[in-house]
């Protein structure tokens, strides 16, 4: 009998953590958990409201609290994290200790295509930024965060990452 895993997806905003995570969870018959949704449900505020009213520092604190809570909970889930989650409060260390981290390494061009004009405006980090500023911000985020993402146990690269690719990589983590 295999032990269910805690699979934690990391990567830039727009890398497909939620979309990919839902598909993978369905394929593995695991629960899908979106960390931002957990934070919103637990606090009663949207991520944007937390950023606006309490600042990024408080958001990162809440993010760490709920990340720890999720990772110490049930087994057999796929967790989609926020793009910055691994980069604060030793979160990547915790993720690697409690689960199998997977970095979705998607090109900036593909992320920009996926996010498009409308999606940039819906994300707190990109609020009130023009297209050029949003693209520059994304490039700066990658430069600042890639060191954390590269600590993931599995790295999947490409603009069309499949669940089959990850399942192949995950086989080593399924234990008898």
Stretches with model-predicted labels:
Residues 35-96, 117:
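ATP-dependent small-molecule kinase phosphotransfer cores
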Residues 98-144:
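A glycine- and Lys/Arg-enriched "phosphate-lid" helix/loop adjacent to the NTP-binding pocket
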Residues 2-3, 27, 143-176:
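NTP-dependent small-molecule kinase module
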Residues 12:
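P-loop (Walker A) phosphate-binding loop of NTP-binding proteins
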Residues 9:
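Hydrophobic anchor at the beta1->P-loop junction of P-loop NTPases
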Residues 15:
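ATP-binding Walker
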Residues 18:
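Walker A/P-loop
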């Amino acid at each position: 009998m295999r032990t269910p895993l805690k699979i934690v997806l990391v990567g830039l905003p727009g890398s497909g953590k939620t979309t990919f995570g839902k598909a993978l969870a369905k394929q593995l018959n695991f629960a899908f958990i979106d960390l931002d949704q957990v934070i919103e449900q637990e606090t009663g505020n949207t991520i944007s409201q937390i950023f606006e009213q309490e600042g990024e520092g408080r958001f990162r604190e809440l993010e760490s609290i709920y990340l720890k809570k999720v990772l110490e909970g049930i087994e057999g889930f796929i967790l989609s994290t926020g793009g910055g989650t691994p980069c604060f409060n030793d979160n990547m260390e915790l993720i690697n200790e409690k689960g199998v981290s997977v970095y979705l390494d998607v090109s900036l061009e593909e992320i920009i295509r996926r996010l498009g004009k409308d999606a940039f405006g819906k994300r707190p980090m990109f609020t009130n930024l023009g297209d050029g500023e949003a693209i520059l911000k994304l490039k700066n985020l990658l430069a600042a965060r890639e060191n954390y993402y590269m600590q993931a146990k599995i790295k999947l690269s490409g603009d069309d990452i499949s669940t089959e690719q990850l399942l192949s990589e995950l086989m080593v983590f399924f234990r008898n």
